[in-house]
Structure formats: C-alpha cells, structure tokens
UniProtKB/Swiss-Prot annotation:
Gene3D superfamilies named in the record: 3.30.70.2860, CinA-like, MoaB/Mog-like domain
Protein name according to UniProt: Putative competence-damage inducible protein
Pfam families: CinA, CinA_KH, MoCF_biosynth
UniProt family annotation: Belongs to the CinA family.
Lineage, highest ranks first: Bacteria, Bacillati, Bacillota, Bacilli, Bacillales
Top-rank taxon, per record: Bacteria
Amino acid sequence: MNAEIIAVGTELLLGQIANTNAQFLSEKLASIGINVYYHTVVGDNNKRLQQAIEVAEERADMLIFTGGLGPTKDDLTKETIASSLAEELVYDEKALASISDYFKRTGREFTENNKKQALVLDGATVFANDHGMAPGMGLNKNGKVYILLPGPPKEMKPMYVSYVEPFLRNFTTGENIYSRVLRFFGIGESQLEVKVQDLIDGQTNPTIAPLANDGEVTLRLTAKHQNVHEAEKLIQHVEDLILERVGEFFYGYDQEFLHYKAIELLKKKGLTLACAESLTGGLFGNQVTENAGVSSVFKGGVICYHNDVKQHVLHVPEEVLSTDGAVSKECARYLAENVRELLKADIGISFTGVAGPDASEHKEPGTVFVGLAIKDEPTVVFPLNLSGSRQQIRERSAKYGFYHLYKKLEEI
C-alpha cells in the first residue's frame, strides 16, 4: 500500500515550526510495509487543501493528514475532507465527554467552538487522544484510507502508537520491514556508488539507498519478508557483496558513529589517548568525552592554537615553526608525539591546518595535517585537502582523526 502524508498548517509553510510528524510517520509506516512516496505541506486554506486531497487521491492508496483538528476557524481539515467525501460530521460522545470534563476540572468555560474538536467523520474509527482534546480518526471509503491525526507531536505520536498502527495493520500484507545502515568514511558518495552501481541498478528486495552526510556515506539496506529472519538473510547477502568491494571504508552500523567506534576499540585494546588541537580547537576532545566511561582511556588534551603554546608547552622546535610552519607535516608529528609524552598516554593525536576563510602561511583553506603517534610504532601524519565552510573543515578534520585512529587500532 502506498501512502501520502499531508501536513496542514500555515505555520509549517512559514518555517515557524519543523514538520517532525512526517519524519516520525514515514519511519513507522515503513516498518509495517506501507510505502510513503510523497510528503505534502499545505496551509490553512480550504481550496488549497481540497486541491492537495485530489492530487493525493490520484497517486496514493492512503492519505494521512496531520493538523487542523483544533477549535479555531482556521482548523478546517475535518470539514474539508467531509465535504470532499460527502460525509457528515457527527459528535463522538466519548470525545465530547472528555473535553467537557477537562473544562469542568479546570474551571474554564466550555465554549461552542471547543465542542468542534469532538466532531468526527460519520462511520470513522475514532482514535482517542490521551494527551489532548481532538480525537483522530480513520475511514476506509471509495478504495482509499483516510487517516486524520492531531498536529502537536506530543498528541500525535502516542495516538499513532496506541491506536493508529493497530488499525493500519488491517491494510498491510503482513510483511516485516528490516533495515540496516552501513556506515562508510574516507570515500565520497559518487566513488562508492560507482563501486556498487550494478547492485543499486539491480536492486529489488532488499533495496539500497545511499546517503551522504557531512563527510560520511551511508547505505540503507531494506528488505521485506513475512519472516523477519528471512529478511535478515536477504540483507546479509547484499551486505557481503558490498563489503567485498568497499569494506576498507566501512566502520559501523546504524547509530554507531565514528567517535563511539574509535573509543570503544580504544577501551577494548586497553590503550590511553591524548590530543593536541590547533585547527580543531577542542572539537575532537569534546566528541571524545561524549562517550560514557571515557575517563578510563582519555588522558586529556592541549588546545595549542597559538604558536607560543606549540613551542613552549608541546616543544615544537622553533625552526620547524619558522621554516615548515605551524601548518605542516613536521609540526603535526611533533604535536602528536609530544602530547603523548606530556600526558603519559599510549597514543597522541594532533590537528593542525587552515580552516579559512583566508589562506594562512601561504596555504589554502582545507589544508590539514592529522598526526598519530602510537607507543612503539612509527608516527604517521595524514595530509588532508578538505572543502567546505570554516566550521565544516574543522568538524571533518576531527572526524578524520577518529577514522584514522579507529583504522590504526584495528591493525594493532
């Protein structure tokens, strides 16, 4: 079954609030085998909402509306749909009693417009609103399913979980949806796609969906099957084919982010870490400490932004700073080695470079060096040539630090 989500509210079009309901519903619907191919946002306008309904009826089996069920004049979702379907609106006695009781308990006047919230489509299944006033409803008519939900997420989400999803399962095939996200770093989206293009072109079940986000690339594998274990087998087969080709860039699944994977491996190896940050100004250390229990492996860091700190605290030779410059392979090497020794850690990592927007030391923005000094191992410096805004370059540099740390830890 194919669905369209129609969010109603001028405040959404004006950007005053984000349409988080659509994200929530899309994820939930996918998990029970309902495809969402369109998101529509329409303002509080009867004519435009009617047009949106007509368009959606041409391309979807299920229309899911959020918003416009309240007591004011511009809350017109129910009225517009009732007119479109030639259905009457009738009072739901349970909802009316619940709303009336609320006003009695709070000592407020129960005005006529508040009674409007208890109106539902005649013949609809009513979804109780346990966290607000206006009930939701579902109606199957003319081969289409119409779902009306309140706009506030704190009302809509629990209503969906408790009442709507069980109702929707009557319209599904019983197939289970299983998804797995593969996370990659150090390879661009276009490069990765080239290596797995034939798999993407031939996808059926499971499907393969690439997504690039802030220097990372993910592949979401999604399979449908009535037996979840069989769905997992379908996923695993395609994953194996993908990792045969781009496994060197793979680092984790789903919500396993780079900093988490690197720190977990650090704990597993029983090694300690120290960082020297010039370019990143503490971003790397901040992400390290987002991980619980990290004090067992993280000694600390030095923000060595000024050359005086590089020279007098981390003992980068003056001739390196004056000849090679602070943005250099040699400087990164000294920073990594000396912060490791200073803080008595097993591993030292360093970041130096040009974040921009202007050049520095005759080096262009995006010129970055990440140093990695591991006890009893040769020091390695990774030169990077990054693009983006000042903040993006700094954040991506920190990510590359975690990536190279993770890959090096895998080797030892």
